[in-house]
């Protein structure tokens, strides 16, 4: 049976043509992003263990991660963590597997602890996963009959939920600028040049006509600045980096950058952290409260509210459909001549094959506001079918970490 793919003209103005556009990104060290990353790290490690030990990825969803902020006392030139950050991983995990030789237990606890601590160790320079963080877990336990799974296995996994996936292409100028601003501040090159720049960077972009204002919350590592003047110099260099980036991404816009607008330097009120993240002192986080699958929060665009991070990469459509919707939109924009803007939505039905959505809704804005032609519709339908035919390939990409969901 043919898939239900509906292609229509998008009746609204381009985002770039709106008077006002708003875009946000919560960076690597933001508490919400830490939760997304921890959830995804655990899912990947569980998937790898299941594959290596049992030959297939078993059921798990660890998309409920909570971070409770600690307490710290940063000061110019130093500081200390007084109360560690607490990270709780929760969800559902297959903990026992019945095989031909009996029941085998899965070392879920060590896998979870190792995944989260390794992620912190690999991505933070001043946050010690042993000294500054307590990692805990509370997971619903389940068992599975491996023989029965292989005997009943369908070629295409069945959706384990009824969900919506949403994606769009291309990114607007503001979206690209916000995304790349956080990335450049958290790049290896910037950390070597400006080691005082912490990992907790949040970027809020506001475009009003041809004017863009970037408000950047940038944690500064207290041990790397010995005075207020050192701190201000770091801010100035970071601003220069961002303005240089903006001159390449948004050359036709007047761009202003405001970093740490809550600072009162004359009173030594500065955004200082011991570890590089605000999570050290009372800023809490949770999975799904931050960036969408494309790495951005875009209130001017249709968005899914699913927390993709930590969901299993085999049949949880809350994860897979959001990834696929963005991929489908990007391909349509790139390959179909005359397409200016694309919005894709996928709707699943629980228990149905994931390559057979209940509906695929594609809205396209053609150049010049023209109606979408019959030829363009056929091309778009062919791309949508091709992406869905290869949907199971996204599982491996997610497990390898080739695709990020935050």
UniProtKB/Swiss-Prot annotation:
Q: In which pathway does it act?
A: Amino-acid biosynthesis; S-adenosyl-L-methionine biosynthesis; S-adenosyl-L-methionine from L-methionine: step 1/1
> Under which EC number(s) is this enzyme classified?
2.5.1.6
Q: Which reaction does it catalyse?
A: L-methionine + ATP + H2O = S-adenosyl-L-methionine + phosphate + diphosphate
* One Pfam family hit: AdoMet_Synthase
Gene Ontology terms: biological process: one-carbon metabolic process; S-adenosylmethionine biosynthetic process
Q: Which domain of life is it from?
A: Archaea
Q: Which UniProt keywords apply?
A: ATP-binding, Magnesium, Nucleotide-binding, One-carbon metabolism, Transferase
Q: Cofactor(s) for this protein?
A: Mg(2+)
Which InterPro entries does the protein's record reference?
AdoMet_synthase_2_family, AdoMet_synthase_3, S-AdoMet_synthetase_arc
Gene3D superfamilies for the chain:
3.30.300.10, S-adenosylmethionine synthetase, C-terminal domain
Residues at which ATP binds: 140-145
What GO MF terms are annotated? Answer: ATP binding; magnesium ion binding; methionine adenosyltransferase activity
* Entry similarity comment: Belongs to the AdoMet synthase 2 family.
Q: What does this protein do?
A: Catalyzes the formation of S-adenosylmethionine from methionine and ATP.
Q: What is this protein called?
A: S-adenosylmethionine synthase
Provenance organism: Aeropyrum pernix (strain ATCC 700893 / DSM 11879 / JCM 9820 / NBRC 100138 / K1)
Q: Which gene encodes it?
A: mat
């Amino acid at each position: 049976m043919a898939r239900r793919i509906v292609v229509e003209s998008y009746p609204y103005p381009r985002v770039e043509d709106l008077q006002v556009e708003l875009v946000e990104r919560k960076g690597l060290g933001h508490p919400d992003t830490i939760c997304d990353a921890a959830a995804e790290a655990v899912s990947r490690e569980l998937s790898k263990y299941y594959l290596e030990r049992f030959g297939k990825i078993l059921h798990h969803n660890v998309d409920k991660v909570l971070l409770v902020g600690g307490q710290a006392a940063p000061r110019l030139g130093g500081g200390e963590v007084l109360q560690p950050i607490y990270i709780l991983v929760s969800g559902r995990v297959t903990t026992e597997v019945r095989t031909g030789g009996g029941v085998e237990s899965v070392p879920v606890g060590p896998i979870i602890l190792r995944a989260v601590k390794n992620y912190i160790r690999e991505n933070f320079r001043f946050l010690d996963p042993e000294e500054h963080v307590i990692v805990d877990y509370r997971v619903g336990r389940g068992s599975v009959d491996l023989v029965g799974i292989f005997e009943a296995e369908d070629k295409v996994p069945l959706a384990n939920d009824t969900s919506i996936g949403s994606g769009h292409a291309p990114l607007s100028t503001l979206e690209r600028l916000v995304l790349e601003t956080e990335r450049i501040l958290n790049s290896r090159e910037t950390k070597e040049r400006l080691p005082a720049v912490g990992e907790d960077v949040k970027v809020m972009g506001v475009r009003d006509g041809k004017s863009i204002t970037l408000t950047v919350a940038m944690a500064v590592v207290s041990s790397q600045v010995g005075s207020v003047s050192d701190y201000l110099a770091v801010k100035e260099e970071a601003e220069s980096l961002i303005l240089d980036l903006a001159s390449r991404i948004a050359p036709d816009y007047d761009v202003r950058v405001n970093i740490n607008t809550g600072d009162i330097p004359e009173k030594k009120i500065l955004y200082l952290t011991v570890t590089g993240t605000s999570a050290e002192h009372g800023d809490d986080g949770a999975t799904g409260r931050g960036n969408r699958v494309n790495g951005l929060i875009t209130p001017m665009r249709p968005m899914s509210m699913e927390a993709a991070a930590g969901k299993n990469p085999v049949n949880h459509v809350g994860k897979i459909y959001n990834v696929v919707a963005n991929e489908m939109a990007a391909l349509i924009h790139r390959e179909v001549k005359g397409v200016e803007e694309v919005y894709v939505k996928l709707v699943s039905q629980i228990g149905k094959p994931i390559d057979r959505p209940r509906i695929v809704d594609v809205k396209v804005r053609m150049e010049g506001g023209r109606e979408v032609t019959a030829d363009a519709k056929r091309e778009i339908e062919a791309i949508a079918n091709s992406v869905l035919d290869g949907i199971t390939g996204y599982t491996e990409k997610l497990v390898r970490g080739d695709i990020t969901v935050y």
